[in-house]
């Protein structure tokens, strides 16, 4: 106890002397309406923006995390005048993610809104979890013994598999066993919003529904009992790869910048707005999913992961924080729980942190996701090229053969004429 008494002030003092060089913030969008349906007219009126869209509560949630980030980083780390070169605000193209990050940015910088970058959904492998990868059908077949008809449905609509996982988890629940036909995801959101729900959906049923709902998310995000390293890699591997490379690049820049001749400020604060299906595998890759969320629980709205990189006596370290509740103004320090980081330590050396997640990193998730299609396209292209080459060679040889045949016939005819001429002269 006495050791802790002396060590703790030392850690606080050391951190106060540290130079922050980069920050990455990854959060789930704020509170939204159910995606598929609501269960009452009251709910329909409450979620007036439409299915899957943000609620008014989300706006307040986004403002709160914006204030948390402003108090922590604006003025002390980035310029309060909002210099776009210092920032990267990147969002999934889905409206709820875009609206969330825009509100966060508006709160952080009062006079100017940071530009938000995004790309079309089919091309976004950074923040949109891919669910239509060919290999996933094989994994799901192993989990659920899919029939050929099931496979066809899963290819058309991957959420068909999520429904299977939801029903399996519901059937295994003593509380919800008879409720497999109920719209549990909608009831969870409606209860959270303070709306009227059926009497059977009491606190016990609500808590059990969170676990059941997590199981439906787990199969789609490749974690928990449905864990797949390749599945995690195609969903969150590119974001991990980007963040780890960014951290290493910032460290190298500051090592070169001992005399202050170059600037290392570009994109030193990066903020990403995404989905629960990416937050889950991201936490799993870091090795902190259960520590952050609890056992078999989904991430809440506007839950956030914050990764700070700093120099302490010119030595680079990382700290990892998690914000689990949309009402939280404090951050939980998860640094000592991250894979490869020294346990129970306040700081993680950069070289250990950046080696945390090798099996979950990819620079080309498109290739891994659509591997068979890509190989098939490459195969088709190669075959077509070879075919044209063979046709060209054949045509060339045919022309040569025709020319040689013509010359042979001409030579033969000339020989015959010569012989006849000789015979006549004799």
Swiss-Prot record:
It is found in: Membrane. PROSITE patterns: HIS_ACID_PHOSPHAT_1. The chain crosses the membrane at residues 389-409. GO terms for cellular component: membrane. Its EC number is 3.1.3.2. It is an enzyme of class 3 (hydrolase). Disulfide bonds join 133-369. It comes from the Eukaryota. The keyword Transmembrane helix applies. Residues 19-388 are extracellular. Keywords: Disulfide bond, Glycoprotein, Hydrolase, Membrane, Signal, Transmembrane, Transmembrane helix. GO terms for molecular function: acid phosphatase activity; phosphatase activity. Residues 410-426 are cytoplasmic. It catalyses: a phosphate monoester + H2O = an alcohol + phosphate. The active site is at 29 (nucleophile), 276 (proton donor). The keyword Plastid does not apply. Glycans are attached at residues 37, 145, 380. InterPro entries: Acid_Pase_AS, His_Pase_clade-2, His_PPase_superfam, Histidine_acid_phosphatase. Residues 1-18 form the signal peptide. Pfam families: His_Phos_2. Belongs to the histidine acid phosphatase family. PANTHER family: ACID PHOSPHATASE-RELATED, PROSTATIC ACID PHOSPHATASE. This is Putative acid phosphatase 1. The lineage of its organism: Eukaryota, Metazoa, Ecdysozoa, Nematoda, Chromadorea.
